[in-house]
Amino acid sequence: MAVQPEVILGDITTLEVDVIVNAANPSLLGGGGVDGAIHRAAGPALLAACKQVLQQQGECPPGHAVITIAGDLPASAVIHTVGPVWHGGDRMEAQTLADAYKNSLQLAAANNYRSIAFPAISTGVYGYPKEEAAEIAVRTVTAFLTRYNPLERVLFVCFDEETAAIYRRLLASYP
């Protein structure tokens, strides 16, 4: 794995990377948490692009990902992925969350992007336990980078120090 994912504490909407990942809801029309923050920072162009995707493709199912323009964000594009709602772990949540990361990475690579920033998908209002979600994120991203690595920079952007510490500890256990 040539690229070692980085952990940063901060605001994903301010990052100068090729693509940021939005922890979206199926409608793609904005909501709370990081989804709302991205929509507010990106302005009306992002909402219009999401409405167009919704009109053409319908809602985005959990585990899937779609790409749009970034509007007023410094990033070039936004990949919207829908993570699972936590129901105790017995409804394929782990696989759906892994798919959200994997499909986002594949979409970034398919569009020739070199840098990507992820929030902690599903750990806000969707209630996924932070530790378990981080384990899935780190495992999925590092496996992708080991097998297929068109990316030069991968960031895990954490909203709080507790989450950042979890990611740092998990990444330290990977070569």
UniProtKB/Swiss-Prot annotation:
Substrate binds at residues 11-12, 25, 33-35, 122-126. SUPFAM superfamilies: Macro domain-like (SSF52949). It catalyses: 3''-O-acetyl-ADP-D-ribose + H2O = ADP-D-ribose + acetate + H(+); 2''-O-acetyl-ADP-D-ribose + H2O = ADP-D-ribose + acetate + H(+). It holds the Pfam family Macro. One of its GO terms (biological process) is purine nucleoside metabolic process. Its EC number is 3.1.1.106. Residues 1-175 form the Macro domain. Disulfide bonds: none annotated. InterPro entries: Macro_dom, Macro_dom-like, O-Ac-ADP-ribose_deAcase. Signal peptide: none annotated. The active site is at 35 (proton acceptor). Keywords: Hydrolase. GO terms for molecular function: O-acetyl-ADP-ribose deacetylase activity; purine nucleoside binding; ribonuclease inhibitor activity. Deacetylates O-acetyl-ADP ribose to yield ADP-ribose and free acetate. Down-regulates ribonuclease 3 (RNase III) activity. Acts by interacting directly with the region of the ribonuclease that is required for dimerization/activation. HAMAP family: YmdB. Homodimer. Interacts with RNase III. Belongs to the MacroD-type family. YmdB subfamily. This is O-acetyl-ADP-ribose deacetylase.
